[in-house]
Swiss-Prot record:
Misc. comment: Heme 1 (or BL or b562) is low-potential and absorbs at about 562 nm, and heme 2 (or BH or b566) is high-potential and absorbs at about 566 nm.
Name under which the protein is recorded: Cytochrome b
Topology of this chain in the membrane: Multi-pass membrane protein
Protein purpose: Component of the ubiquinol-cytochrome c reductase complex (complex III or cytochrome b-c1 complex) that is part of the mitochondrial respiratory chain. The b-c1 complex mediates electron transfer from ubiquinol to cytochrome c. Contributes to the generation of a proton gradient across the mitochondrial membrane that is then used for ATP synthesis.
Organism this protein belongs to: Syrmaticus reevesii (Reeves's pheasant)
Binding site for heme b b562: 84, 183
MF annotations from Gene Ontology: metal ion binding; ubiquinol-cytochrome-c reductase activity
Gene designation per UniProt: MT-CYB
Cofactor: heme b
């Protein structure tokens, strides 16, 4: 019998073993769709971004008008820009749900996969931040000024570090140029880390909702999960296209329709919605260095999750107390997101402080404590 080229060709067999004949657990739910959706998001962002870069000028005097020109005069430029801007939002929706799935089902016990995932999240956040600066509107400029300024809180080297990042004594032309270079480069870095992430995942195989070994019952990825992923894609594409075509500016800030002006500070400087939870934690501490440390900890805490797992069961499927705590954490993050969008005044200050405190308490203290309690209740 002639050898199957899909299984014998040096390149095709890698694709085959990753996407076609990959043995997958027979019971993974729709929560396992988000990995492939993230891959689609990344591909879409790279393609639309490449097309936008062809019409963009990374210069303070031309950036704003070059974006306006793209939307007005380039064939389907408005569509490409709207897809790119809202694609970022959907990228973050998918990654948050993907991380939530990992937390709920104990996927973090695959430590290498989890750690590369956290690095991916950090790189994505960096990419989104530098990208938001490129249209050179008011919120772009002041967002860049405020967030880069946080590095000045680092003792001794802070101020030097900030001026080195800016390429001068304020956010100006050199800053915009390097941010464009970084925004172009980072998605390809993300692609590289994604391949590493997948490589680590395929060493162990996927986890499943029961958290038990699925070696006794595997099915091929194609056609079962390839089809299921296409369904998930269709379900994500519907709200994505609805948003991008009907209300493309819904999630943006109206302030960014005004060209950047270093002499006028916007009344409320706030980042895009997907950073608001971290921004709320930053603002809740009335000290610059403390706030910066809390901001970093709010994301880096994910690296500690595998070490805080005290339960004898991997997933939360059969652990109602941990489930209640998990959904409390979700509600807490929604409150932080909302508070981050509000002005710094009573009662938002105290709400933000309480929500920030409970965020760290739930993750660092309550999850391990409840896990241990459940072990005792189940006589493990």
């Amino acid at each position: 019998m002639a050898p199957n080229i899909r299984k014998s060709h040096p390149l095709l067999k890698i694709i085959n073993n990753s996407l076609i004949d990959l043995p997958a657990p027979s019971n993974i739910s729709a929560w396992w769709n988000f990995g492939s959706l993230l891959a689609v998001c990344l591909t879409t962002q790279i393609l639309t971004g490449l097309l936008l870069a062809m019409h963009y000028t990374a210069d303070t005097s031309l950036a704003f008008s070059s974006v306006a020109h793209t939307c007005r005069n380039v064939q389907y430029g408005w569509l490409i820009r709207n897809l790119h801007a809202n694609g970022a939002s959907f990228f973050f929706i998918c990654i948050f749900l993907h991380i939530g799935r990992g937390l709920y089902y104990g996927s973090y016990l695959y430590k290498e996969t989890w750690n590369t995932g956290v690095i991916l999240l950090l790189t994505l956040m960096a990419t989104a931040f530098v990208g938001y600066v490129l249209p050179w509107g008011q919120m772009s400029f002041w967002g860049a000024t405020v967030i880069t300024n946080l590095f000045s809180a680092i003792p001794y080297i802070g101020q030097t570090l900030v001026e080195w990042a800016w390429g001068g004594f304020s956010v100006d032309n050199p800053t915009l140029t390097r941010f464009f270079a970084l925004h172009f480069l980072l998605p390809f870095v993300i692609t590289g880390i994604t391949i590493t992430h997948l490589m680590f995942l395929h060493e162990s195989g996927s986890n499943n909702p029961l958290g038990i070994s699925s070696n006794s019952d595997k099915i091929p990825f194609h056609p079962y999960y390839s089809l299921k992923d296409i369904l998930g894609l269709a379900l994500m594409l519907t709200p994505f296209l609805t948003l991008a075509l009907f209300s493309p500016n819904l999630l943006g800030d109206p302030e960014n329709f005004t060209p950047a002006n270093p002499l006028v500070t916007p009344p409320h400087i706030k980042p895009e919605w997907y950073f608001l939870f971290a921004y709320a934690i930053l603002r809740s501490i009335p000290n610059k260095l403390g706030g910066v440390l809390a901001l970093a900890a709010s994301v880096l805490i994910l690296l500690l999750i595998p070490f805080l797992h005290k339960s004898k069961q991997r997933t939360m499927t059969f652990r109602p107390l941990s489930q209640a705590l998990f959904w409390l954490l979700v509600a807490n993050l929604l409150i932080l997101t909302w508070v981050g969008s509000q002005p710094v005044e009573h009662p938002f200050i105290i709400i933000g402080q309480m929500a920030s405190l409970s965020y760290f308490t739930i993750l660092l203290i309550l999850f391990p404590a409840i896990g241990t309690l459940e072990n005792k209740m189940l006589n493990y």
